[in-house]
Amino acid sequence: MIKSTLIFRDDGLPLCSSVDDDTDPSLADQKKKVKVLISRFTPQSANEATLESGAYEMHYVRQQSVVYIVIVERGYPRNLAFAYLADVRHEFEHSYGNEYVKPSVRPYAFVSFDNFLQKTKKIYNDKRVQGNLDQLNSDLLGVKQIMTKNIEDLLYRGDSLDRMSDLSASLRQDSKKYRRSAQKINFDLLLSQYAPVALIGLFFLFLVWWLVFR
């Protein structure tokens, strides 16, 4: 179940937060962790990730200097969580354009957006429609490729969300290895295919030369 939604500017300014009926102290603690997490972002941080935190999971998406975060109960389908965030992001961008970048913007300046958050959360929490949404989005979101980390490691053990440069370097290295292997395989294949033909051709030329010039 979706528990809470938070929208921040990537410099830490809170733009909007859902008004939640749940007064569980553990949920309030998750929101505090979110604020600390936002302060740890760097330009190299992953643009989307899942963070495990006790009985909850936090999913976030960074887009155009805005971070969209949803806190859900453990076990809530991850593809639905990211589909929900996509809906939230599209509506927020459509409703406010680039207003959030203005220096005069105050904290929670877009609190009226909670109306959309509440309606959309209700849809995604409805068991009768979750099955259809899950099936609809299963092929649209490559959630298996989204990084998953434990938030305690990020906040207290020095782990980082900055995987992008490491991932790019790894992909480049793997690409080089693959290219070298592919070149060797192609060369070996050509050799096995044409070496006998070349040898026969050379033998034939030698035979002609020997018969003509002996």
UniProtKB/Swiss-Prot annotation:
Subcellular location: Membrane; Endoplasmic reticulum membrane; Golgi apparatus membrane
Transmembrane spans: 193-213
GO BP annotation list: endoplasmic reticulum to Golgi vesicle-mediated transport; intracellular protein transport; retrograde vesicle-mediated transport, Golgi to endoplasmic reticulum; vesicle fusion with Golgi apparatus
GO MF terms held by the record: SNAP receptor activity
Nucleotide-binding in keyword set: no
Residue intervals annotated with topology Vesicular: 214
SUPFAM superfamilies per UniProt: SNARE fusion complex, SNARE-like
SMART domains: Longin
Annotated Longin domain residues: 6-117
Keyword NADP recorded: no
Residue runs in coiled coils: none
InterPro entries assigned: Longin-like_dom_sf, Longin_dom, Sec22, V_SNARE_CC
Residue ranges occupied by any v-SNARE coiled-coil homology domain in the UniProt entry: 132-192
Location, primary (coarse class): membrane
CDD domains: Longin, R-SNARE_SEC22
Topology with respect to the bilayer: Single-pass type IV membrane protein
Taxonomic superkingdom: Eukaryota
Pfam families xrefs: Longin (PF13774), Synaptobrevin (PF00957)
Keyword annotations: Coiled coil, Endoplasmic reticulum, ER-Golgi transport, Golgi apparatus, Membrane, Protein transport, Transmembrane, Transmembrane helix, Transport
Function description: Required for transport from the ER to the Golgi complex.
Family, as annotated: Belongs to the synaptobrevin family.
Protein name as catalogued: Protein transport protein SEC22
Species name: Eremothecium gossypii (strain ATCC 10895 / CBS 109.51 / FGSC 9923 / NRRL Y-1056) (Yeast)
